[in-house]
Amino acid sequence: MPRLTWCAVVLVAGCAAIACKDDGEQTLPPSPPPTAAQNPCPASSAASAVIGDAASPSRSKNSGRVVHGDPRGMLGDVLWRHRAGASLRTASAGVTSRATEDVGEIAVIQDEGDVVTPANTFDLQLSGLRYTPRTGGGYDVSRTDASFRAALGDAVTLGDDDSVSRNVPFTFNFYGRPQTLAWVNSDGNITFGVRDTAITSRDISRLLTGAPRVAVFFGDLDPSAGGRVFVRSAADAFTATWCGVRVFDSPRQVTVQASFFPDGTIEMKYAGAPALTAVDGIAAVSPGSTDTFLPVDLSTSATRTISGGAGAIGEQFSLRPDLDLVALSRKFYRTHADRYDQLVVWTDEVMTPEDTFSFEVTVANDIAGIGLDRFDASGEFGSNDLSSLVQMDAISKFPDDPATKFLGENNTLSVIGQEVGHRWLAFLHFSDHNRQNSEALLGRDLAHWSFFFNSDASVMEGNRIEDLGGGTFRTTAAVERYSLLDQYAMGLVRDIDVPSMFYVESPTGLPANTAADSAPRVGVTFSGTRRDLLINDVIEIMGARQPSSADSPRVFRQAFVFVVGRGRTAAPAAVAKIDRIRRAWEPFFLRAVDNRARVETRLNPGT
């Protein structure tokens, strides 16, 4: 939840400064030595793909995916990356006079080494890591040889976002808790207590707030696309090996091995290219449900032991630079009034992860009844009024004409509509026909409408669905507007203004790979059982929206911000393109909400 995640990250800095040191530690005996050559994975298990560039950022779990994971979990990750990135950034001495300037209604902000964190490329190929328990709790990290253990054990069948459990034949003491059952997950990690088959972002927030985890390479891996996973559960060691496992929708692959031993130590082994070519992932251990994370440079373990603490410890790797939204927001507010509800941010290079097109992060919420906790982290971003930031990413990713369809059923304006809409949507559960709490309206990441929900062509996904009779349905439109249910969550209409709705249960006769979390698609005919619901069914589970529509704003203030990379200047054509989008966005939003509200995108609104 946002409040929990924010508080967790606030504590990270304190952990790094004072809580992650134990001078009374006692080094335990080394774990049993590996007994194999570097990479014992059978050649037949390797993914049959050439090494090359990763898939287009518009691709992910479904073609046409627009955002990165559940925006409810983004806040903690953004705040953590701000703190961790400070050690990687090198800000210029002083601030130049052109660091921030307005070009018309676009705020141009120059990176001076203060808002963009350089890429942290994966550098553990042909290496081994040993995590040694500390007497005060947690783990220290040191280097060990890169040889994999020869006995791989049994091959297990894992699909995408899948998991298999195995008993541990000894009591493994992990962060002070005995573990005798391990879940080997397809995404390059082992969890204790529960499996992890979620499709949400493989980020630091999930590492911290999820289950206790040994993450040898925590990334979006898909064994069904290539490679094999092996598990050996023996008295001397529990070992899981990912042999040539493909990264989702990418030619990249991962060959890694994680082992843990009766004495409590953990070893992680990494192959070299071409067996290991993935770039975005996390190498770490975490006790789960923790408030602390110590980000470290694991490559330095070759020359020293890295002292950890009672919380998680590890490193996140990314091929691309990272835009620090916290630092950016603070820099923006140093030269602009605190009058904005949202910042809509564009960049002159790609800065989102490989599986991300654009995303939104909610930084404050005072609304009940929409599926979000009430919390306020706006102060972290240098504001009292900011509620949300949207990272649209590189302007070059978007067509010159904002109305041109280019991302599934989406055009640029509907993409903005979805990202802006994540401030309120889509998180609604309801009481179903059995009077049970249901999330059947929800699709991807439980933060978008289901493909099978008649969402009236909402920009928050789903489709407009025509009931053809006889249990047959057809999708007729998509990503055109905010439905009346959307507008209820946004505070623009009363509950009594929301008409009866329906979704289709147990759908059949679908095109291949079509599921609830699929991107909208017009012209799909399928069969199923119609289920009707009313807004009162939503309120029964979520509670009434507070404040009501009578007390909710009708004007949303947004600033369009263009971040220019260090040493570069803002290209006039790029600024003009962003302004063209900005001017088209205002009337699009007005139509999308049936003239019930407007966005104001001028800088210095109200003046």
What residue spans do the PLM features occupy?
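The catalytic-center signature of Zn2+-dependent metalloproteases
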Residues: 409-492
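Bacterial N-terminal signal peptides that target proteins for export
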Residues: 1-9
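Intrinsically disordered, low-complexity proline-rich regions
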Residues: 27-35
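Zn2+-dependent metallopeptidase catalytic core
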Residues: 169, 178, 314-420, 515-606
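C-terminal motif of bacterial Sec signal peptides marking the signal peptidase cleavage site
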Residues: 16-19
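Bacterial signal peptide processing site
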Residues: 21-23
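Short linear, low-complexity motifs centered on an aromatic residue
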Residues: 253-257, 481, 495-528
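Extracytoplasmic Ser/Thr/Pro-rich, glycosylation-prone low-complexity segments
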Residues: 39-328, 485, 542-607
